[in-house]
Regions:
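Charged (often Lys/Glu-rich) extended helix/loop segments that serve as interaction or gating elements
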Residues: 67, 78-222
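Active-site loop/helix belt of alpha/beta enzymes
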Residues: 1-104, 189
Length: 222
């Protein structure tokens, strides 16, 4: 950026972390200060991006505090952290139902949820979502390939094992599904979305926040 016209530039942003502890942030800041320290003295704020696993057990928050205070003191600027998935880590479940089971080279189960519609981040990252009470293939007695109910050939959630055979109508609970997934869903071919609900563990009540209808799909199409 040497010689660049930076008039009107109020702040700088870097986004280099993903599920990292504050030691990775410290290494990044050392590089930022070495290469862009002169710019930090000319701006009003620094956005350190996301990817900070602040809520994870063992995260070094004391180091994070020290790093933030150090930047503020050295340059007199505001410091921002993007919340990222840490604010929802380990929260939220996606409750699905087994629609049918069959056998074609291996045991299969069709669910009323779709990885392309309801769990797109699992495809894009990609990562394998955890199912409560399930294991990796052949870890438990009965292994199934789980698929969604859309016409997409690649709508395959993955292979999981269960202690007992799956049955039509059985509920399967996908864990840790609150981050990214909800904001990236699609209504591919009019597939129905699950409702958003809040569970109160003290009163043991479930409050429905939003239910989706065909009208939501129609209106998104213009």
């Amino acid at each position: 950026l040497t010689g660049a016209d930076l008039e009107g530039l109020d702040g700088l942003n870097f986004h280099t972390l993903c599920e990292q502890d504050s030691d990775a942030l410290e290494a990044t800041l050392e590089g930022v200060e070495a290469k862009f320290g002169d710019l930090l003295r000319r701006v009003k704020w620094l956005n350190m991006g996301g990817g900070h696993h602040i809520t994870r057990a063992g995260y070094d928050t004391e180091r994070l505090i020290r790093l933030i205070k150090g930047i503020k003191e050295r340059y007199g600027i505001a410091v921002y952290l993007e919340p990222g998935e840490a604010i929802a880590l380990g929260t939220g479940v996606l409750v699905s139902t087994v629609l049918d089971t069959l056998h074609n080279a291996m045991d299969l189960a069709i669910l009323d949820v779709s990885i392309t519609c309801h769990m797109p981040d699992c495809l894009e990252m990609p990562y394998r979502p955890d199912i409560r009470g399930a294991g990796h293939p052949r870890e438990l007695a009965h292994t199934y390939r789980l698929g969604g109910g859309t016409c997409l050939a690649g709508d395959i959630i993955g292979d999981y094992s269960f202690p007992e055979p799956l049955a039509t109508g059985q509920r399967l609970i996908f864990e840790d599904m609150a981050h990214y997934t909800m904001v990236k869903t699609s209504m591919f071919n009019g597939v129905k979305h699950p409702a958003f609900c809040l569970w109160d563990p003290e009163s043991k009540t479930l409050k429905t926040i939003r239910q989706f209808t065909y009208g939501d799909f129609r209106d998104r199409m213009g």
